[in-house]
C-alpha cells in the first residue's frame, strides 16, 4: 500500500508484471548489486526488515535497533546508514510522500483542502484527513514547544495528547487504507456460501483467520485467496496478493 500510495514506479511495474513479485528480493538485489536469483535467504530477510521498518521515516540509528529486534541482525551504524540511504534512494517517491505529509499538518491546521497523495485519495480538511473509506481525525491539532525547546505538532488533550509528525501521518494513512482493504475482503467473503457459514475468528493486521470444518478448509482458503487478490473498487489500480495455509493452530498456519 505504501509503495502504491506514492506511485513508486519500480514497485508498481513489478506488481504489474507479476502479482506475486517479491519486493524484498528486488531491494536485496539492488542493495548488494546482484541479480534477484542470486539473493540469499539472509539477504532477503534483511531486505524484508528494511521494507517493513523504513517506510515511515526511521533513521539509521532506529533501523539498527529494528534490524536486531525484527531479524536478529547485528549491524554497525555505518551498515545501517548504508541500507537506509539505499532504501531512500530506491524509493524516493515515498520519501517525498513524507514531506507532503509534513505539509499536510499545516493544511489541516489552516482548514485547507489539499490532496496528500498523487491519487487524490487522502484529502485534508479542518478536522484531519478524508479518504474514500472514512477519515482520520487529529482533534485540537496545534504546534507547541517541547521540553527541549523544539516546536512540534501535537493533537488531543490530557492523557490523549500525542505527537504527530510526517512519518506518523504516513503510517496512519497506510494503515487506515490497508485496514479497510482487509475489511472489504472480509465483507465480500461474508456474502459467499462459505462466508454465510463461517465468521472470522480473528484478524491481525493483514490477516484473516477462520476456524472451519476440515472438509471445508480447502474451499475456504481458495475463496479467501481469490477475494484478497481482488483490488478494492475504490482503488482498482492497487495490486493485491495473498497466500494462506491450513493448520490445527494459528501458529501452525503462519
Residue ranges with predicted function:
Residues 1-254:
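Conserved catalytic core of nucleotide polymerization and phosphodiester-bond processing enzymes
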Amino acid at each position: 500500500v505504501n509503495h502504491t500510495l506514492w506511485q513508486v514506479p519500480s514497485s508498481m511495474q513489478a506488481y504489474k508484471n507479476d502479482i506475486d513479485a517479491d519486493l524484498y528480493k528486488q531491494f536485496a538485489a539492488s542493495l548488494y548489486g546482484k541479480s534477484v536469483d542470486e539473493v540469499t535467504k539472509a539477504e532477503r530477510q534483511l531486505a524484508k526488515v528494511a521494507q517493513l521498518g523504513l517506510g515511515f521515516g526511521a533513521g539509521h540509528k532506529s533501523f539498527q535497533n529494528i534490524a536486531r529486534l525484527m531479524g536478529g541482525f547485528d549491524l554497525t551504524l555505518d551498515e545501517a546508514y548504508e541500507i537506509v540511504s539505499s532504501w531512500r534512494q530506491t524509493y524516493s517517491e515515498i520519501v517525498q510522500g513524507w514531506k507532503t505529509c509534513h505539509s499536510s499538518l499545516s493544511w489541516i491546521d489552516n482548514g485547507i483542502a489539499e490532496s496528500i497523495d498523487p491519487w487524490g485519495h487522502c484529502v485534508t480538511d479542518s478536522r484531519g484527513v478524508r479518504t474514500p473509506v472514512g477519515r482520520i481525525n487529529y482533534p485540537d491539532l496545534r504546534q507547541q514547544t517541547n521540553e527541549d525547546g523544539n516546536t512540534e505538532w501535537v493533537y488531543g488533550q490530557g492523557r490523549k495528547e500525542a505527537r504527530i509528525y510526517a512519518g506518523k501521518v504516513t503510517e496512519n494513512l497506510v494503515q487506515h487504507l490497508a485496514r479497510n482493504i482487509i475489511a472489504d475482503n472480509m465483507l465480500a467473503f461474508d456474502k459467499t456460501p462459505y462466508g454465510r457459514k463461517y465468521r472470522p475468528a480473528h484478524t491481525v493486521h493483514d490477516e484473516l483467520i477462520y476456524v472451519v470444518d476440515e472438509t471445508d478448509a480447502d474451499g475456504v482458503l481458495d475463496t479467501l485467496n481469490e477475494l484478497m487478490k481482488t483490488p478494492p473498487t475504490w482503488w482498482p489500480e492497487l495490486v493485491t496478493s495473498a497466500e494462506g495455509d491450513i493448520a490445527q493452530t494459528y501458529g501452525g498456519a503462519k
